[in-house]
Amino acid sequence: MPECCNNDDYQSVFSGRFARRQSRRYRRRGLTPAARGIVDFATSQGITGATVLEIGGGVEHVQIELLRRGAEHVTNLEISKNYETEAARLLDQAGMTERVTRRFIDIAEAPDEVEPADVVVLHRVVCCYPDYAKLLEAAARHARKTLVYSHPAANAINRVQFGAENGYRWLTRNDFRTFIHPPEQMIRAAKANGMAVTFQRHARDWDVVGLTR
């Protein structure tokens, strides 16, 4: 568990209600632009028959799309157990339950307990982790071919929004915090294990970075 919060604080933010909202949005609208950018990049690098490791996959929408495009199997690493009901429902509806393994583990703290995969994905995860370098370095070590992650765009609008959300959590005595980490420093951490940046998508809300080995 990252040092920014205790387990109760984390569970209260990534609650069952949050999971239902994410699941409902995916059913109605499909992938967000950032999630679509992740899926498209991973697919462009060769997804057929690939194994995927998604760190913090939540309700599984990115994984489902990668499996539909030809990935063989996905391992999802999670900290919050509040996603389980919605994730199981989406996987069942997609007929993909047997192709996904869900584990509860923090890869940055226990990297040796996680097997490598062809593709490693982190969507809207780095912003929730205080030690981004440790997380991204661990993710890169586990990527045989491709690493792709999203992060909040480092602009004034996002800084105001994140600051307001963190301020509210401070007032309610919730120690969970979100972060807008330095984009270039994140790239440096991701490249530390022999990977090279081959794709970047910039947007007002979420940026996407893709690396290959």
Regions found by a protein language model. Give the residues of each.
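Conserved class I S-adenosyl-L-methionine
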Residues: M1-Q45, G49-G58
